[in-house]
């Protein structure tokens, strides 16, 4: 029975006053499901049959073996060279044997438990689990009262508070709006501070070079009350990196990703291409290129 429909009003109360009271916002009006991570029940739709998947896979392997991927990072190329990849001193291009690729990719776990500072917000990445986050890094924000405006710290903080409040949002996937009133040189410090003080959910760090990543790891470690060894015992934060298509990984993202991987933190590799601009115009060709770019970075990070 819906108790909102029950009333203890006497006969002198009017229907209008009853409706007015009913429409007044209350905490119960914004009820939500309890915190929890959903799991998919149905198997995902297979876009291709087994033969089609194998053709895409073989095309990606051919790209890695014959064309190669540019790694614009000296340490990354040296690591790959020591692993047996073809690396030339006069070129950033690295070619990989498919045997090495499959060997290293097979080491990546199928299930990762992410542990933020509040262990009750623990998440599973992989298997049939789903995890949702808010949008990341839009330049502008808008609401009904003030309309559209450039991102700023106040709105950034308010959106973080909403992220914390909604149980359907499981982690902080980046800046919910870019606070452009903070200077870029220190923006990551203020933004991470707000993430760690206004939310207790899993946080993300942008993989943009040495200082930002090292600062982010230190702040997450301090917020969780851990020493360096304790921080590295389990994944407690994550980043995602994009390839610089076509067939290239640049220095800032590689450096940040490598630093996080050394501390056993999660790195998600997400190639971003536009078919016909940064990738072949055909869907199959674009997917083969993306697969090659993704696998190349995963091999490096597993090494």
How would you label these PLM feature ranges?
Residues 147-303:
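Helix-rich catalytic cores of soluble enzyme domains
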């Amino acid at each position: 029975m819906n108790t909102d429909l029950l009333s203890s009003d006497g006969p002198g109360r009017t229907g209008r006053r009853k409706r007015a009271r009913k429409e007044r916002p209350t905490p119960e009006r914004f009820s939500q499901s309890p915190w929890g991570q959903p799991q998919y029940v149905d198997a995902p739709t297979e876009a291709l049959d087994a033969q089609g998947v194998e053709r895409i896979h073989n095309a990606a392997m051919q790209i890695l073996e014959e064309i190669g991927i540019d790694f614009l990072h000296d340490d990354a190329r040296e690591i790959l060279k020591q692993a047996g990849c073809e690396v030339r001193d006069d070129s950033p291009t690295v070619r990989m044997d498919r045997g090495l690729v499959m060997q290293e990719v097979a080491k990546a776990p199928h299930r990762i438990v992410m542990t933020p500072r509040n262990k009750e917000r623990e998440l599973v990445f992989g298997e049939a689990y789903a995890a949702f986050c808010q949008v990341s890094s839009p330049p502008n924000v808008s609401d009904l009262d003030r309309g559209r405006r450039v991102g700023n710290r106040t709105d950034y903080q308010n959106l973080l508070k909403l992220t914390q409040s909604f149980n359907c949002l499981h982690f902080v996937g980046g800046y919910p709006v870019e606070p452009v009133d903070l200077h870029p040189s220190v923006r990551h410090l203020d933004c991470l501070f707000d993430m760690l003080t206004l939310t207790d959910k899993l946080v993300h760090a942008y993989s943009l070079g040495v200082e930002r990543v090292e600062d982010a790891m230190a702040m997450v470690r301090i917020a969780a009350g851990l020493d360096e060894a304790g921080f590295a015992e389990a994944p407690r934060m994550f980043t995602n990196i994009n390839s610089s298509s076509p067939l290239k990984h640049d220095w800032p993202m590689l450096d940040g990703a490598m630093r996080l991987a050394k501390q056993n933190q999660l790195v998600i590799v997400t190639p971003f291409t536009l078919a016909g601009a940064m990738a072949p115009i055909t869907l199959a060709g674009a997917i083969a290129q993306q697969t090659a770019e993704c696998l190349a970075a995963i091999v490096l990070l597993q090494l």
